[in-house]
């Protein structure tokens, strides 16, 4: 029995909180039973007793009926459709989807107003998010559940979201996940989740903390936009040229680039390079380039596991940061995995899928990135600041070059040889520092936002385990941070 875990459960208790009548050992692991014992030792309820609405995209009708009335749009339209990828990135502006008014009205059973708790069905099943108020019509995307609570519920959505993201809450949710590939969670499981009951005083403090965190996050985005505007105003890049006629002779087209497709020669690209010629520029990679480019590994899904080294994919990366990876890799995936860990000031740059996303590492981090993320290291960071370069890589200057090079592919792929030849404008060091300062202000505000949210989650966990008084005292000690 050495190394084995045993749980002794009375037969009469097997059906408790077991709506699927599971009898497997996984369901009765000690960590699950202990989490339940902690919640049930104090006042508690279930989501079923507290919600006024638990719905999803498919509540609007059969697959066939929905398909006849639903079209997902890339360009801005009447209503925004919230997806897991947007929630993970905490970005509701870039690379988002929309639906028309007729589609929004058809999807009447899954309208989102802000303040709801959204829960993943698959992918990272059970992962929860607090939906912000976007001040526009919003429709719920596929593969998400939405919970709206009663007016007289014993818990509010902010506290529910915090609880579901604590160690105890996530353990209870994890017990409800079923299936093999893909793992899923269903409505019945969501309804049965046990939740703790707290005093109004404690919950109001948590709500204020999360509001403060959201305000810091808003300020962080505003600071980043200021940095983007400095670059945009100096370079005067126009990415909205709608002209689609371009006349080229053979020496200016195929003989020069090897491309014959019309998309490659759109006037907006000519306008971009004409604007760049007004400034000092340098190629991104190559012998005389700005950076050294290194590749990571692509281990394949057979190597994915629940414990080990976090595996960062393109879907985890935005210009604002890296979301918590749900996939891990074995620690023996390669002989010396630490050589794959990105170091401080390394710029992660996506070449597949959503191409051209850049994020600069704020510190040495023990993660392994997908082969779709290149590692860029600035050769001379005193002349070209990594924060400045990262902002340029995320700007229309580089996004237009990515669009031109990868156009026409069903799955976007940006060849490393093309990435090496990306043209980067080099502004004077004073302007670079001004831009970098705004970027650093943005990330400092974001860290403060994340810290406040983390403190609120820890306070919920402490209140469950030690009582509200202990949690409030702990928060008071950190009020000056």
Residue ranges of predicted features:
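Non-catalytic DNA-recognition/assembly elements of restriction-modification systems
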Residues: 1-66, 199-297, 429-481
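Sequence-specific dsDNA recognition surfaces
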Residues: 48-70, 85-114, 283-300, 315-344
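Short, surface-exposed loop/turn microsegments at beta-strand edges and helix-strand junctions
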Residues: 69-79, 88-91, 95-98, 110-112, ...
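Short hydrophobic-aromatic micro-motifs
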Residues: 80-83, 117-120, 310-313, 342, ...
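A short beta-sheet element
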Residues: 83, 108-110, 121-163, 338, ...
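Conserved, well-structured beta-alpha core segment at the onset of a catalytic domain
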Residues: 130, 135, 158, 169-176, ...
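A short glycine-rich beta-alpha junction/loop motif
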Residues: 137-145, 178-201, 367-374, 408-431
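Short, positively charged
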Residues: 157-185, 387-414
């Amino acid at each position: 029995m050495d190394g084995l875990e045993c749980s002794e459960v009375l037969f009469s208790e097997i059906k408790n909180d077991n709506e699927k009548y599971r009898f497997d050992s996984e369901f009765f692991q000690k960590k699950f039973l202990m989490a339940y014992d902690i919640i049930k030792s104090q006042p508690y309820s279930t989501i079923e007793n507290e919600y006024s609405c638990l719905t999803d995209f498919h509540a609007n009708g059969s697959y066939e009926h929905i398909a006849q009335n639903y079209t997902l749009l890339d360009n801005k339209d009447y209503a925004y459709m919230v997806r897991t990828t947007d929630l993970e990135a905490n970005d509701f502006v870039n690379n988002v989807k929309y639906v028309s008014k007729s589609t929004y009205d058809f999807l009447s059973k899954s309208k989102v107003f802000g303040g709801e708790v959204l829960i993943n069905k698959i992918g990272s099943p059970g992962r929860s998010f607090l939906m912000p108020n976007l001040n526009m019509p919003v429709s719920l995307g596929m593969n998400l559940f939405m919970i709206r609570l009663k007016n007289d519920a014993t818990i509010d959505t902010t506290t529910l979201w915090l609880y579901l993201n604590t160690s105890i809450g996530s353990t209870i949710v994890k017990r409800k996940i079923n299936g093999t590939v893909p793992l899923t969670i269903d409505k019945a499981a969501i309804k049965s989740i046990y939740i703790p009951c707290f005093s109004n005083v404690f919950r109001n403090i948590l709500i204020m903390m999360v509001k403060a965190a959201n305000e810091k996050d808003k300020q962080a985005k505003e600071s980043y936009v200021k940095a983007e505007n400095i670059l945009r105003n100096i370079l005067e890049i126009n990415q909205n040229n709608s002209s689609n006629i371009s006349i080229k002779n053979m020496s200016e087209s195929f003989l020069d680039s090897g491309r014959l497709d019309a998309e490659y020669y759109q006037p907006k690209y000519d306008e971009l390079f004409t604007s760049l010629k007004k400034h000092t520029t340098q190629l991104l990679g190559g012998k005389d380039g700005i950076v050294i480019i290194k590749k990571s590994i692509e281990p394949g899904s057979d190597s994915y596991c629940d414990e080990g080294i976090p595996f960062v994919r393109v879907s985890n990366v935005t210009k604002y940061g890296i979301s918590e990876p749900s996939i891990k890799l074995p620690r023996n995936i390669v002989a010396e995995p630490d050589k794959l860990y990105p170091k401080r000031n390394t710029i992660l740059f996506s070449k597949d899928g959503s191409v051209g996303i850049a994020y600069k590492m704020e510190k040495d981090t023990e993660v392994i990135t997908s082969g779709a993320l290149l590692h860029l290291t600035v050769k001379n960071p005193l002349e070209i600041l990594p924060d400045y370069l990262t902002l340029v890589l995320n700007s229309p200057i580089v996004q237009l070059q990515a669009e031109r090079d990868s156009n026409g592919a069903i799955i976007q792929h940006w060849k490393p040889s093309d990435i090496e030849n990306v043209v980067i404008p080099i502004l004077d060091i004073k302007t670079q520092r001004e831009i970098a300062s705004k970027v650093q202000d943005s990330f400092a505000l974001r860290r403060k936002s994340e810290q406040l949210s983390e403190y609120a989650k820890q306070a919920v966990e402490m209140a469950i385990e030690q009582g509200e008084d202990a949690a409030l005292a702990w928060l008071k000690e950190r009020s000056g941070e």
